[in-house]
């Protein structure tokens, strides 16, 4: 790109280069004008643990007093704090340039959807300009030897960010590299349970990581059912929150989201022993205290049977015994006609 007059760095392009950034703006605005309604900006300012900085003063401050002769834009020596001011100048100028591009896209289409999946951090400030931000926990793929381990790895990051650190960022506006399905080496039940637990996090931006040639007919059916469920409960996602204990400590945990007429609760027992979990249906889960209505219970994972009551009100205690590795999702609605019939079998959803 350099030979064509574009400002390049060691790893990628300069986010403050006048020629390159104007070309980028012109092109994405052209695409938006042609009907493209989704943009994913990835690799901004580098990628994962690699960072690229503008050292030549192109569109940002130059600091020759730092003696940068012989430095590359991703030089490890830039980790020294004496270069922080220069790096801040570049990141600030580059971010301001991106803001102008995001605003231009919004002018073309107010409903345009923008994901910034690198070069950002979990601050609600970003949501003035974009719709979702990558979780940025340096783990594209959730680690673990099985689905249970994958869920614990990612859900523990959620627990750390929202329960331990109390980060003020809406959970539905984060992006993960999930759900994934890359092979046939699991039962349909294991994939189903993993999928619904994953979706119950309330991520408003669901990007599938699948190898289509590896999916069976049942996998496609499960995927379709899961996405239909996510679409049904999507209006609840902006209220989603985490409940329960620590995934890392093998305590029962899950996610909860409600509005005035419906809600859901997911549960995961990551341990190798049976556990009984008690939770009160109140404001801490997101229920509205002024709502005096009966919520009927069903489950997208099967019949709810006698393990929970057929209906609940605000302030009721829900008690559920979960088998080792079990996943359960409960739907609550005050419209009796919209939930599946209650059977005699319990929910049995073991994540292998």
Task: Give the role of each language-model region.
Residues 76-80, 301-308:
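Short, basic/aromatic beta-hairpin or loop at an interaction surface
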Residues 7-14, 248-252, 315:
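Active-site-adjacent structural elements in folded domains
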Residues 1-169:
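Aromatic- and carboxylate-enriched substrate-binding clefts and catalytic-loop regions
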């Amino acid at each position: 790109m350099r030979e064509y007059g574009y400002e390049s760095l060691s790893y990628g392009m300069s986010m403050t280069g006048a020629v390159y950034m104007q070309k980028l703006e012109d092109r994405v605005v052209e695409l938006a004008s042609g009907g493209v309604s989704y943009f994913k900006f990835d690799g901004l300012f580098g990628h994962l643990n690699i960072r690229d900085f503008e050292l030549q003063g192109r569109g940002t401050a130059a600091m020759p007093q730092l003696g940068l002769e012989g430095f590359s834009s991703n030089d490890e020596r830039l980790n020294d704090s004496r270069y922080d001011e220069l790096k801040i100048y570049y990141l600030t100028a580059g971010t301001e340039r991106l803001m102008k591009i995001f605003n231009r896209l919004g002018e073309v289409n107010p409903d345009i959807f923008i994901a910034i999946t690198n070069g950002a951090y979990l601050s609600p400030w970003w949501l003035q300009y974009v719709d979702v931000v990558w979780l940025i926990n340096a783990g594209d793929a959730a680690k673990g030897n099985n689905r249970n381990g994958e869920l614990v790895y990612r859900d523990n990051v959620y627990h750390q960010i929202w329960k331990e650190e109390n980060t003020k960022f809406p959970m539905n506006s984060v992006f993960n590299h999930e759900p994934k399905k890359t092979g046939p080496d699991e039962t349909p039940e294991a994939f189903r349970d993993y999928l619904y637990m994953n979706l119950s996090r309330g991520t408003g931006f669901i990007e599938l990581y699948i190898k289509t040639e590896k999916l069976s007919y049942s996998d496609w059916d499960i995927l379709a059912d899961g996405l239909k469920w996510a679409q049904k409960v999507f209006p609840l996602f902006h209220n989603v929150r985490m409940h329960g204990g620590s995934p890392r400590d093998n305590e029962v945990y899950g996610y909860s989201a409600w509005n005035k007429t419906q809600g859901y609760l997911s549960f995961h027992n990551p341990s190798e022993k049976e556990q009984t979990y008690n939770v009160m249906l109140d404001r801490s889960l997101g229920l509205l205290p002024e709502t005096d209505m009966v919520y009927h219970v069903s489950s997208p994972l099967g019949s709810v049977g006698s393990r929970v009551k057929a209906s609940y009100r605000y302030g009721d205690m829900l008690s559920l015994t979960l088998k080792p590795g079990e996943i359960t999702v409960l739907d609550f609605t005050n419209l009796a006609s919209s939930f599946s019939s209650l059977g005699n079998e319990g929910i049995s959803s073991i994540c292998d």
